[in-house]
């Protein structure tokens, strides 16, 4: 077992309610990406995601695409080659 796992699980337990609250805030934004009528809501969701990432210490920005905007966030100014990274593709 990873030696960091117990600390990670404890932190998740401690922040469960706050994490769920953030999730529900995002889910309340009507960001239906398949319906053009909700394009503004998709932008709102992207801005919300970027702002929330910044609140918890990430460098985050909203970037334009040919479709809906995408959110890019980094937890450090530079990434050393070979370090692990995460791609999260989720709601909005």
Regions found by a protein language model. Name each.
Residues 2-92:
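Acidic/His- and Gly-rich active-site-bordering loop/insert found
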